């Protein structure tokens, strides 16, 4: 290059390196301008993704607005050049050969210095109004799988490519070059689609410092690793504004010129779908990440509670004895008492069972209370009382259970003068007891203490089993099996398990318990027969004057039915089969509750809808009972005696944490816990009600065709 020739700073920096296609294009435009006939204008229109319009004046001035970056030139494709006046064919051929020569030299690693005809004088820059024209992706590749890319000189940006202002010479020659669309050909360094650079990441000086071949090699290596083809593989590029999918945009319609910065985009190093793939990858990573711990509120559980089978139902204790206010005494036994209490925070009422640790150790009943807690915590049945809280202090154990307003079923029977109920009503209560016993047997527990005193009446009138201190868990139980399709064999859960404990109420004891030969789950079906008999006739079948006579009657005498009350044959047959002295032949000893349900006595019972049926008796609060505010006022000023001081101590002690209890403590396995699930059906305290004696209202819609007592619900005693 001669000394008279002007060289820009970027050209000096690029000495010895390959020239990019934008520089070649700019140099050829200058050469084209120098060879233009005097007095003629050449308009160059570059239509691509980032296109602009360059006006070449007769004075060989190329005015470009690049916003301070002379190297930010548009990508010269699609490219088409025409003249507005007649040119000689030799000049056009010379320009064409010069352009192809420089384009072929740009693929090498070095650029030989070439001379350009004419003297370039640096003129002041002027703003070029450019317009962003969207290139159409509508095109039909030819047989050579190439896309024709042309640059069209026009007088107006938005004019049709085929229109040429002024007269066009017939010997004007169309200059075109082809850009490959085959993905396999993208490795060619001379491909113009790989030479464009992104002006956002490049400066004037760094544009020529990037090695083109290294970037192309890295790009194709990434493509081969990812197994993805070039984003331009199936696209056809066209410079026609008519075919543009955005030809109806406001900018094109109104032809408003805009001053924009031409952007150089390196398609090889930054494919069109890179940003989209990055977003999809981020979304995929976000989906794979686990939820944060702050989104999940896990209830606290002690180490011992987490090892229990019912650990998921409960959490660490949330109450203490001071959280409850005593209302009245519901009952008492040899080792504890049951109180009606009100929780201060929620205003809900519960039945709180308080057990004395010293008395339990003295009477060797530690294992019983542990079994009772396990059964209550494990059970989830509508006919078994619900345990809400259990905790212990230094001297007491506490079981906070659901309060059954109807009290003991035995008391409901005692409100009748005849002390009995009709057969249809007895069938209803017996059905619910069978469902509860079946559930316990499926869990592997034997109840062993079924009697009217341990059956409570819910506020809805349905029965609920309680007092599981005499229950036992069968060891080595098996899984239940299906027999006769719809019937479940529940006896198999405790098959082979026998115990020699002499427990239960003497009038309800089974013959095998009295003999001491050991007993199985069949003892519960014996007690069911005694219960049905007592509901129908008001007494037990083998009651004697003393315990020895009662045991003798159980072992030797058969069941007899009074003649003053009529019962169905199916009812008598059921009682006889349940009170069979031979355990192996007793009804329910083979298939458990399935044998009981198949009996004709329960033929019309809808076992799946027991909870939805109307109970015979509905407990109601009696207006003649003691008022609750008076009871509370008495509790605020108790009498100073040993009993009141002991009760006061029960509600003032501090709860012991599970992990703080020594393993040598006999009550180490008694868990302090609260039910996790909130129950919104719990009775709430109200000053408008009295929590004294209970009346049992009859449901008159129930059929009682076989009952000899026509005035069944007319002789109810108003008080307990």
Swiss-Prot record:
Residues 324-602 form the Protein kinase domain. Its EC number is 2.7.11.1. InterPro entries: Kinase-like_dom_sf (IPR011009), Prot_kinase_dom (IPR000719), Ser/Thr_kinase_AS (IPR008271). The modification Phosphoserine is found at residue 203. Keywords: ATP-binding, Kinase, Lipid transport, Nucleotide-binding, Phosphoprotein, Serine/threonine-protein kinase, Transferase, Transport. SUPFAM superfamilies: Protein kinase-like (PK-like). Flippase activator that phosphorylates DFN1 and DFN2 and which is involved in the generation of phospholipid asymmetry in membranes by the inward translocation of phospholipids. The gene is KIN82. It catalyses: L-seryl-[protein] + ATP = O-phospho-L-seryl-[protein] + ADP + H(+); L-threonyl-[protein] + ATP = O-phospho-L-threonyl-[protein] + ADP + H(+). Gene3D superfamilies: Phosphorylase Kinase, domain 1 (3.30.200.20), Transferase(Phosphotransferase) domain 1 (1.10.510.10). It comes from Saccharomyces cerevisiae (strain ATCC 204508 / S288c). Belongs to the protein kinase superfamily. Ser/Thr protein kinase family. KIN82 subfamily. Disruption phenotype: Simultaneous knockout of FPK1 leads to decreased phosphatidylcholine and glucosylceramide transport into the cell. Residues 1-20, 99-128, 230-257 are annotated as: Disordered. This is Serine/threonine-protein kinase KIN82. It comes from the Eukaryota.
